[in-house]
């Protein structure tokens, strides 16, 4: 089953889900999530991966803020921020966005 073209995507999904389940989310999990969003957006024909962030009641301003945070966690050039532990609300943000994303797009194992 892991030899399918989507084996990589499922592997990344499992890594992120395990980090959420074990409450050990780190900055690099946001990078992995962005990678998953980018690949899914490309597959589904979206121009922007941020369009896949579909939390009910989320405003455009919230979406832009989430995208900025994911970008900063993914492309961080400041070493001080690399080592900085995530706050509980940042860990919860990944959980909210990831679980909404996997639910909305009907991801299966």
Question: Where are these predicted regions, by residue range?
Answer:
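Long, charged low-complexity segments
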Residues: 3-22, 34-109
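Structural motif
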Residues: 21-29
């Amino acid at each position: 089953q892991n030899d399918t073209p989507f084996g990589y995507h499922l592997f990344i999904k499992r890594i992120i889900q395990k980090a959420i389940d074990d409450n050990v989310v780190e900055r690099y999990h946001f990078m992995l999530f962005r990678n998953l969003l980018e690949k899914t957006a490309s597959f589904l024909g979206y121009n922007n991966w941020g369009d896949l962030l579909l939390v009910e009641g989320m405003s455009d301003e919230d979406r832009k803020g989430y995208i900025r945070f994911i970008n900063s966690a993914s492309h961080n050039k400041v070493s001080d921020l690399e080592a900085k532990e995530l706050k509980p609300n940042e860990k919860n943000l990944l959980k909210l966005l990831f679980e909404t994303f996997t639910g909305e797009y009907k991801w299966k194992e």
